[in-house]
Amino acid sequence: MAEQKRDYYEVLGITPDADQSEIKKAFRKLAKKYHPDRNNAPDAAKIFAEINEANDVLSNPKKRANYDKYGFDGVDGEPAFNFQADVFQSFFEEIAKSGVFNNQTNPEQKEKKKRYHWFSKKPKQEQPEINLDHVVEQTIKKVQQNQNQNKDPDELRSKVPGEVTASDWEALVGDTRYGYFDETGDWSWKGYFDEQGKWVWNEPVDSETSEVSVEPEPTPVAPEASFEEAQPEINAEPEASFESTPTPEPVAPEASFEEAQPEPTPIPEPIPTPVQVQPLLLDLNLFTIPTKATKDDLLFDNINLTTYEQVVDYLNSQATPNLAKTDGELQTIDGTNPLLLEQCKKIKKQAEQLFKKLFLKKQLPFITQPEVVEESKTSFDENNVNLVYFEKVPEILFINQQPKEVKYTRQVFDGLTNKTTSETITLEIQLLQTPKETVSAIFKGFGNDHGKGCGDLKIVFEKIKSPFFQVNEDGLHSACIIDPLVAYNGGIIDVFGPYTNFQVKVDGEIDINAIMKFEKLGIAKTKRKGDLFVHLYYSSVPKKKLTTNPQVQQFLELLQAEYELLQDNIKSLKYFKNNLVIPKKPLDQQSYQYLSQEPIS
């Protein structure tokens, strides 16, 4: 089993919001400490390579942006240097050039060097002493130069000879015109760079500097995400215990037809192709990522979000001393992803245009507006709610009963410093299939803390209706566009289930508006609603020769875009699980919180 990597920020001992100067400072300090020539520990070389790997990613704006968004998956495909070959070699080259260790390990060579200076006819010039700190600085510069070779030409700003800017500060280390090495071996500057990047001397000198405008760095571009069809495995720390639903054996779809006319005509049973069904339903626990203020507040275990009742064990910890009523104003956070919302609108618009070509309305005939469901009367006490999290979620996540990651920031008052700080909390909430358009839950003690106790957090999820699926009393309903020639002569058609599509071979003479029934391929975890009903609609234009019907192909692409919404959520969960930190101490309390939902009859 491969050893799990440590978080790059943890390796360098910095926070995720650290700037480039802090990253360089941390790298220099750790590189000097764990360099194999100075540290004889068995794992020094391994730690040194780990430090350089973290610096290689975090010091590169593009790689750092990808790592912050996708974790190790975002940088695994990026070209990287060989740590053993490049980093150590660069250190040894600088050491060899400087002669730091030669003078210490070879007295004869040192004596020869002295005699050479004694008999040299050239006047003796004062040379700055080069120590290991300077070697580390030069190695940082060389590694960053290697990184610059992979950058776009537009990112590399050309320098005018003799021009000094703030971005050149590394090249000036060791230049006695701009600084000197003190008695401790540290480099001291004779001036500084102002906010405009202009060099300013500490004392008046006869040197002119020109002001240069620094171009802003380009915004990092995230790599285009690609999602696999199969469900990714979710790994956790050994201390974490995640319960997952056992995967049933693959079941081949048994298709039968039901006619919409009063007198149905018997149709031969189609021969389905073998299909491996891998349910995407996950039964996972609820955890929060520990921060400085919430480390003692992780009192959650065995979360089971399968009922509409609310049960709460009040939390008592250093982070939440009490749950008294707070005086803070109500704060609302909109966690809706604007890109996801725009993608859902685009899918719906293109689907409506296709339905019009099929002589249908703006939606499929079997999709109807759900009946208004009255809010269930719960024991929710919203008097202490001072933080509301709202997010629009695609309906396909509810249909597949997916966990949903909720990441928000709250305000926490520190009684020791009398200051209010911000902390980020990540919750994972199980979504359930429900006729409601909106579901909500209240989490005690997860709101803002203004000094008089932590308030409560209210989470509200609103469905983004799917134009292709609907859950009715008898099961899950979807659609299929079929070419008229295939319907008459028979062939292979694409059928769409709750989380993937599969191909089925059908015989000819299929009437329009026929219904195919697939047992146990609907929504899992239910017995009465476990079937899938596929409504067949003719395309308005037939295919030409051996080409694919354009309307059938367009419908397939739209459904694939709908499935990508589901795969995107799964990928986000995988990243969350891989970076999950679980406290090693046994949990002495539990807190159970359930979504407010009507029971499914």
Swiss-Prot record:
SMART domains: DnaJ (SM00271). Residues 5-77 form the J domain. InterPro entries: DnaJ_C, DnaJ_domain, DnaJ_domain_CS, EAGR_box, EAGR_sf, J_dom_sf. Residues 143-163, 205-272 are annotated as: Disordered. It comes from the Bacteria. PROSITE patterns: DNAJ_1, DNAJ_2. GO terms for molecular function: unfolded protein binding. The keyword Repeat does not apply. The keyword Chaperone applies. PANTHER family: CHAPERONE PROTEIN DNAJ (PTHR43096:SF48), DNAJ HOMOLOG 1, MITOCHONDRIAL-RELATED (PTHR43096). The lineage of its organism: Bacteria, Bacillati, Mycoplasmatota, Mycoplasmoidales, Mycoplasmoidaceae. It comes from Mycoplasma genitalium (strain ATCC 33530 / DSM 19775 / NCTC 10195 / G37). Residues 151-160 have a biased composition (Basic and acidic residues). One of its GO terms (biological process) is chaperone cofactor-dependent protein refolding. GO terms for cellular component: cytoplasm. This is DnaJ-like protein MG200. Keywords: Chaperone.
